[in-house]
Structures are given as C-alpha cells and as structure tokens.
Amino acid sequence: MTLVIGLTGGIASGKSTVAQMFQQCGITVVDADVIAKEAVEQGMPAYQKIAETFGEGVLLETGDIDRRKLGEIVFANEEKRLQLNAIVHPEVRKMMIKQRDEAIRAGERFVVLDIPLLYESGLEHLTDKVIVVWVPMELQLERLMKRNRLNKDEALNRIHAQQSLDEKKKRADAVIDNSGSLKDTEAQLHQLLDTWSNIEK
C-alpha cells in the first residue's frame, strides 16, 4: 500500500532540501514547480490557452512563453492572474495525479507530492499525510533576504503573501524543524518514515 505524502512549507523554509532527502532515500518526488514549467511548454494544452488568452505579445521569437512578460501582466492585474491560474492549475493537478498514480501502480511504499502552496491551493485531499517544513520566522526572513538579495520589507512582503508557517504547522500531520543542522533534519525525516512504514492507510 502506497502512502502519499504532501510536502509543503514556506518560502526559504528549506522544503527543497527535504525533497532532495526523500529522493536520496529512493522515494519518488512529484514536484509541482517542475510540472508547472512543463505544463506551459509548446504543444501542451495550457500553452495553447495562454497564447489565445494573452495574445502573441507573451511569446518569445522561439514561440516559447516569455515568463517575465507574462509575470508582469498577471502581477499587475488580479483578474489576469486568476485567468492564468484557471488555465495552468487544472493542468498541473492532472499531471501530478498521473505521476502519483503511476507510483501507486508500481507498488512504491511512499510517494511525495512537493507542493509549495498545498494548503493555499486546497490540494491536501490528494495526499494521505502532510509534512510541513518549518523554521522560525526570524530565520525564514534572514534566509530569504540572503538568498534572494532582498531588503527586509521586500522579504516580509513575500512571506506574508503566503499562509504563515505557524498556521500550516497547526494543520500538518507532521512537522520537520529545519532550523538546526542538515543532520538533524535528516534524522527527523528518517524517524517519520520509520513510523509511517508501519501504518496501513
């Protein structure tokens, strides 16, 4: 029986690091961000709809979508942002479910759905258990400012654009505290996998 684990966190909480740890354990990780990029490539249904909805002005000379230009349009206009989400999100969901179900059919013990905005998108129903990668707010802020070269206000705006980590923590089945060393984080992950290996769905 396959246990489907939802993996989420906040910006700069270290979720990608934990996703890599799952992969190092030989566990399939279905990455929503990677799929979102694939979903808008030429020849995909979402690509066609974006070109029709937003016009050829959002296409590069190669025919690929100009992500920067599209980003500028949707961040400046809430209605356009919702339009884009309505095109892309259903396709991403479909592709994620397909990859999840392939892992289940293959009889894998675990499969991880790595979804940054899992709760915000209401996708927890696709999983059996949810892990939130958590760090204290001060550390999240410090890491984000350093990683993205942002000032404090810019970093805070990005953090507040998502549901707070403490809120996600309350809703999760398990929390990995990523404020210590990588070794600490890895130990928590292995402990969880050991515990969940013994449960039936």
Curated annotation (Swiss-Prot):
Main localisation: cytoplasm
The reaction(s) this protein catalyses: 3'-dephospho-CoA + ATP = ADP + CoA + H(+)
Gene3D superfamilies: P-loop containing nucleotide triphosphate hydrolases
Gene Ontology biological-process entries: coenzyme A biosynthetic process
Pathway given in the UniProt record: Cofactor biosynthesis; coenzyme A biosynthesis; CoA from (R)-pantothenate: step 5/5
GO CC, any one term: cytoplasm
CDD domains, alphabetized: DPCK (cd02022)
Boundaries of every DPCK domain copy: 4-201
Residues reported to bind ATP: A12, S13, G14, K15, S16, T17
InterPro entries: Depp_CoAkinase, P-loop_NTPase
Pfam families noted in UniProt: CoaE
Keyword Transferase annotated: yes
GO molecular function, one term: ATP binding
Family listed: Belongs to the CoaE family.
Record-linked PANTHER family: BIFUNCTIONAL COENZYME A SYNTHASE-RELATED, DEPHOSPHO-COA KINASE-RELATED
Function of the protein: Catalyzes the phosphorylation of the 3'-hydroxyl group of dephosphocoenzyme A to form coenzyme A.
Protein's UniProt name: Dephospho-CoA kinase
